[in-house]
């Protein structure tokens, strides 16, 4: 490979994409700088020289955000980037998923792919630049990678598909789709949509694949020009004689164990066979390498038999038909003090989701590279070890938990009511209590139930289902509602969430080459049937969102004030608004357009805070009459409070009909008197009169007396 800088360019969605090689990070096995518009991402690939002594492929993909890319200095005391943001973790997963299947079985060398985002143009996706850069860094390196791959973002505006939409176009789009794959096949899909039909989603995927083919042809030109020769790597293989011996000893018993229907009983039966075989070789004092190979052979026996049963004999591990969904059970309102709760059980998968409603001030603040500054809807997913009957350390959420939480959020967001219709922040937490596959989709179903229980006026209920595929030669079977073993040993994990009208989220990972459009179409239609079945079950438990919120949920009232008066409500250094909050115990959020949201669980305090704010922003008009309290007495008159925050002056000459010698002769501090606004001067000072009202009253009495005499 040449060490001189070389530059390659292509047009991508009307913006130039440039790849630079041979200048940066030259000690990595492969490195490229991808410029897309003003976005710049450095992608590198490195690999260990020797294979690691592990039974899996040790691949790490990191997408690293740097705040200098958008001209920001990190917040906090340390002033440097800390742990990766959720967006960065999701981007890392997005790049990992299409790359991972393209390494040979038995490849055990450690591989690390790192993309550093160095400059961001919001209209030119840094994730897509990083995906292309990661593929290219591997492809031009000597690492045995069977790529390249590429990715594209697809939107739809007014019925027309758009590649890599700009920020403005994304706001108008009803599809947000990321598709990745090789020139021959798609192997990764990640999508959110606004209840879009399955047929349209399929067309969008195919539209994206056409662009992928063009980007791969571009990469192949670069590899031809600067690529290194691939290194010869010894792949991990089991000994042929050992393979035959283990199979003769275990195959028949293992086949019987696999067909035990109940998950734990099946696992116990399989483990019993494994234990017997391992003990046999331990008795022969086999070394660690041999025992490792024995485990590998036993795993392959299980995998091959499960796949054969599904594709040829059409038998699933738990005895279901291909399109059959496990038994469903749901319940709502099981936690009294929470704002809403939903328990969803599907076979041996169970999720308990809790909905919490908060004020708009409870939104999540985002300090990242994107244009979004906050979000008012959150879905968090927890996967404790007891859900699979295991013990392990309890730590914070990992990549998997964050990814599963994100697909739930994406699936539910299109049906969340607008801030105008429902001025609340909504947080969902899904606790996985039992797991045997499809937990992310169970969390979507549980979360829908929880929000309906909480009284969130959803546009439509959402359900999710995980589809699978097992393909052997010409034989294939599409599976509805896959369980853990089918996910692990199958060729596809295809999660589909949506309403009765259409899809709201898709996530697909494919482990094989050449998935045809027909299989995809069949999987989507089979998923729709399953989704509608699950929705009907959920609606039998709670047909519509509750009409009233929980007694423990905050009550929110909305009012509008003149934007020029916002500073009066806040006061110098927040003094006024803090006083209201301290006095009433409410939360107050003020938008720039003058919309004010007041929230607390006490409606009486909400009303009190609203009255105080109304008084602060109220405009005094000449001619208005007030019951005013005397606050201060001076020689020249009395200062009175018309309402909270607004005072006026009753001059001594306006206190009474007769001449007043001393103000104290008429009023004292604390008295309440009726006054009329007679003037507001240029400086905004309010002049009041008591005398005018007394005179008007005197004249009314005189007229009344006159009328009385005439009647006599």
UniProtKB/Swiss-Prot annotation:
KH domain segment(s): 554-613
Gene Ontology annotations of biological process type: mRNA catabolic process; RNA catabolic process; RNA processing
EC number(s) from the headed UniProt entry: 2.7.7.8
An annotated GO cellular component: cytosol
Domain S1 motif: 623-691
GO MF annotation terms: 3'-5'-RNA exonuclease activity; magnesium ion binding; polyribonucleotide nucleotidyltransferase activity; RNA binding
InterPro entries referenced in this protein's UniProt entry, alphabetically: ExoRNase_PH_dom1, ExoRNase_PH_dom2, ExoRNase_PH_dom2_sf, KH_dom, KH_dom_type_1, KH_dom_type_1_sf, NA-bd_OB-fold, PNPase
Primary location recorded for the protein, binned into one broad class: cytoplasm
Catalytic function, reaction form: RNA(n+1) + phosphate = RNA(n) + a ribonucleoside 5'-diphosphate
Intracellular or extracellular location(s): Cytoplasm
Annotated keywords: Cytoplasm, Magnesium, Metal-binding, Nucleotidyltransferase, RNA-binding, Transferase
Annotated positions binding Mg(2+): 487, 493
Cofactor section: Mg(2+)
UniProt xrefs under CDD domains: KH-I_PNPase, RNase_PH_PNPase_1, RNase_PH_PNPase_2, S1_PNPase
Pfam families attached to this UniProt entry: KH_1, PNPase, RNase_PH, RNase_PH_C, S1
Membership in a protein family: Belongs to the polyribonucleotide nucleotidyltransferase family.
Function: Involved in mRNA degradation. Catalyzes the phosphorolysis of single-stranded polyribonucleotides processively in the 3'- to 5'-direction.
Name of the protein this chain belongs to: Polyribonucleotide nucleotidyltransferase
Lineage: Bacteria, Bacillati, Bacillota, Bacilli, Bacillales
